[in-house]
Amino acid sequence: MAYKTLSPAFVKPNSPILIKLAKAIPSAEITAKETKETISKMLKVALGEQMDIAKPILVGLAAPQIGISKRIILVDVKANGKGIVGDLRVYINPEIVEVSKETAEWYEGCFSTDRVCGVVERAHLNNY
């Protein structure tokens, strides 16, 4: 299947914003208008990508992928690699605090790398 190219909402592959550490959001700013606007923009991009059946399924999105250097991610916790999507959750200043020793391999891609895909080994379970 031929997929459409990278959405204009995403920064170009190898963009410096994808390499540098994103800024943490202070507790006092979590409910601020700017944070809400960032999340709204991310949801709009993510939902638009998920509705376009000509593209791969978007399972996660980090704010830096759309040019915003903040520690906000969206994760579709229902995505199973078989086309099931629809439960996007927002995480602010996420940290992985525990991972299982058991791993699993998945064929993955990333919207920030355009058409680069491959098999990635990850912890089977993560706790945030």
Region locations from a protein language model:
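Positively charged
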Residues: 1-128
